[in-house]
Amino acid sequence: MSLLDRAIEKAQAVLLAQQTPNGYWWATLESNVTMTAEAVLLHKLYGTDVDRPMGKALTYLRNHQCKNGSWELYKGDGGNLSISIEAYMGLRLLGVAIDEPCLVNAREFILSAGGITKARIFTKFHLAVIGCYDWRGLPSIPPWIMLLPNQISPFTIYELSSWARGSTVPLMVVFDRKPVWLTEIGRASCRERV
């Protein structure tokens, strides 16, 4: 048996040993702080934050901030602009004041890394939804393009994988409608220079 075959066998054994008797795996989903910041955003938008443990989200976001004011995509990357903006947004939506040291340091990092205009599209999308970024700064594909015959359409959703279609089609509609749900904190955050 080759070294590769033995390595594959060992990896399979480790994975199968962790499988539950019902056939699935149960483990912690590890990610960066964007999942938490986005959950805060959704709960604030839907008004479901009142009966949720938002204090845990606040603690989690604060505890994962780096000394340079940023939040990382992965451990040791030195800080990621988009993730730092989303964490900042999450903290503001949770009521953290703009003059608190964690946000002052975050703002310094964000500005030194280029600010919102250099962030990823999804970060800008989250900010646009709460009125803190202009929808005109986001690229969009009009949803009606899906109605064009394939022969003349520059784009067909069937060129995308099934999982990509599942998120692209709804996003095309949202980008077309350009909704803005301003929360009080969202309005206050919009006046900040980040």
What are these regions (language model features)?
Residues 1-194:
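Preference for long, amphipathic alpha-helical scaffolds in soluble/luminal domains
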